[in-house]
UniProtKB/Swiss-Prot annotation:
Name of the gene: treA
Family label: Belongs to the glycosyl hydrolase 37 family.
NCBIfam families in alphabetical order: PRK13270.1, PRK13271.1, PRK13272.1
The protein, known as: Periplasmic trehalase
Gene source species: Xanthomonas oryzae pv. oryzae (strain MAFF 311018)
PANTHER family noted in UniProt: TREHALASE
Length: 568
């Protein structure tokens, strides 16, 4: 199939994953074939062929889907796409088309008769007198799901082992969330469950060729920040170095997914997740296979695209989807004017955090090769080194911090964000760059409640004034790696105090936090604040271990205990 230029410098390709591709000056043929080694078997089913991709709700019953979402039948656009059709979706849609014009037709009654509702994850039936650490230990069982078989027509994807969901509206496993959740599981001694989650992600790679955003059909067209190598590293800390070789095949497939399309991309062009800069350097961006509204946010996306007059709607949809893949949905980082979602251009941005994670993946692949010093180990290490050089050349702001790069306008962002600490977390920063980044962060992003996501207020949830548990951990861990103990402690203790304060008032942990003194949970975004909450639980346990005395023994303020009926 010939390449189709979707927009300036953006090449769409249907090519297979790279097998002999020039990446950062090295040929992939030097190490992909030699490194396809026999590894220890996974404790997961052997997958002989890719699983058929199930239709998404907007594909399975398009007219009914649009009627429900555009009619705002439910407050949350994700609610309906998680419903279980009780019979063949094609028949349901046909019945809708035959009946919807009839006098007295009731759309809500039609949906109720043909679908089973998926309730949110309930976490509020725990004793009210528990201390924070005990509360988290009691939360884990409430967040565990086991779905090795799902009913026909469900948007949920089956997984062979139990897994932990975030909580609230998030009834499925999420890729990057899970690393921070797994940190907490290991800290809680639940290493078997942590291993099972890692095996689930290996299964998804083997089954679909990548780890999707989450285990839903409507998430299959994209991934999320690539933390699989960090998960392998975490489990190796539990089981030993053999873990690296066990997951080598899946690490290679993960890398191939993110580098797919690099075979033919020319300087100044992009293909899928890959961008080749004018000097030949190859870095990565976020991207999505589809360029339609997200089913789980259909009305939000169509309204955003309708505000854009100078770009095709398909471009806007892909940028919205790519923003969802980034995990930062949404933020001023992706906005051309820094304020309005209608100016989103995620696919034009080379993010510092994504490329730091891929550096770690390359380093992990080098380590995972069977013999130290083998050709594949040297070649993956060389790729990591060349990515580091490209990051230093293009993503380092001389004002003293790492930033994102716009490959279309060839400009480096002047915005400082929490993502600037990812190079420290990945261990790629020089001592000088780490010191200067820490100094800039100390001046610009430290708040009474921890590390700010950005210094810009837009109303988007990944901007000021919100703080997010995963970014606190990336900061604390990265700063500690480079000897910035005082700043790490300041961020960690302040965020932990914020978590403890809200827990004392409301007896819950939430998805995001406001960072001002005595602030409530964070705001903004496309949905209400969620509690549970997987990654907050994991990071909180890590911080309690690092900085004991900051809420480790404190119990919440006394409250009137809800009855079980009220909790339900």
């Amino acid at each position: 199939m010939p390449h189709v230029v979707a927009r300036s410098g953006d090449v769409m390709s249907s090519a297979a994953p790279p097998s002999c591709t020039s990446l950062l000056g090295l040929s992939l043929s030097m190490f992909v074939a030699p490194c396809t080694l026999t590894a220890a078997p996974l404790d997961t089913p052997v997958v002989n062929a890719p699983a058929p991709t199930p239709p998404t709700p907007d594909q399975a019953y398009p007219e009914l889907f649009q009627a429900v979402q555009s009619g705002e039948l439910f407050d949350d656009q994700k609610h309906f796409v998680d419903f279980l059709p009780l019979r063949d979706p094609a028949l349901i849609n046909a019945d809708y088309l035959a009946q919807h014009d009839h006098p007295g037709f009731d759309l809500r009654k039609f949906v109720d008769a043909n679908f089973e509702e998926s309730p949110p994850v309930q976490t509020d039936a725990i004793r009210q007198d528990t201390a924070l650490r005990e509360h988290i230990d009691l939360l884990w069982p409430k967040l565990v799901r086991s779905q090795n078989h799902v009913p026909p027509y469900s948007s949920l994807l089956s997984l062979p082992h139990p897994y932990v969901v975030p909580g609230g509206r998030f009834r499925e496993v999420y890729y990057w969330d899970s690393y921070f959740t797994m940190l907490g599981l290991v800290k809680s001694g639940q290493t078997t469950l942590s291993r099972q989650m890692l095996d689930n992600f290996a299964y998804l790679i083997d089954t679909y060729g990548h780890i999707p955003n989450g285990n839903r059909s409507y998430y299959l067209s994209r991934s999320q920040p690539p933390f699989f190598s960090y998960m392998v590293e975490l489990q190796a800390g539990v089981e030993g170095q053999a873990v690296y070789q066990r997951y080598l095949p899946q690490l290679q497939k993960e890398y191939a997914y993110w580098m797919q399309g690099s075979d033919d991309v020319q300087p100044g062009q992009a293909a899928r997740h890959v961008v080749r800069l004018a000097d030949g350097s190859v870095l990565n961006r976020y991207w999505d296979e589809r360029d339609t509204p997200r089913p789980e946010a259909w009305l939000h996306d169509t309204r955003t695209a309708a505000e854009v007059k100078d770009r095709p709607a398909a471009e806007v949809y892909r940028d919205l989807r790519a923003g969802a893949e980034s995990g930062w949905d949404y933020t001023s980082r992706w906005l051309a004017d820094g304020q309005n979602l209608r100016t989103i251009r995620t696919t034009a941005i080379i993010p510092i955090d994504l490329n730091s994670l891929l550096y770690h993946l390359e380093r992990t692949l080098a380590q995972a090769c069977a013999q130290p010093g083998a050709a594949c180990s040297r070649d993956y290490a060389a790729l990591a080194q060349q990515r580091k050089q490209a990051i230093d050349a293009h993503l380092w702001n001389k004002a003293g911090y790492y930033a994102d790069y716009d490959w279309q306008t060839r400009t480096l962002s002047d915005q400082i964000t929490a993502a600037a600490l990812y190079p420290l977390f990945a261990g790629l920063a020089s001592d000088d760059h780490a010191k200067r980044t820490a100094s800039t962060v100390r001046r610009t992003l430290v708040r009474p409640g921890g590390l700010a996501t950005t210094a810009v207020k837009t109303g988007q949830q990944w901007d000021e004034p919100n703080g997010w548990a995963p970014l606190q951990w990336v900061a604390v861990d990265g700063l500690r790696r480079y000897g910035e103990q005082a700043l790490a402690r300041t961020i960690g203790e302040r965020f932990l105090a914020q978590v403890q304060a809200l827990f004392a008032r409301e007896h819950k942990l939430v998805e995001k936090y406001g960072l001002e003194t005595n602030a409530a949970g964070g705001g903004g975004g496309e949905y209400a604040l969620q509690d549970g909450f997987g990654w907050t639980n994991g990071v909180t346990l890590m911080l309690l271990n690092l900085y004991p005395g900051k809420g480790a023994k404190a119990a919440p303020a006394k409250r009137v205990r809800k009855t079980e009926a009220a909790a339900r």
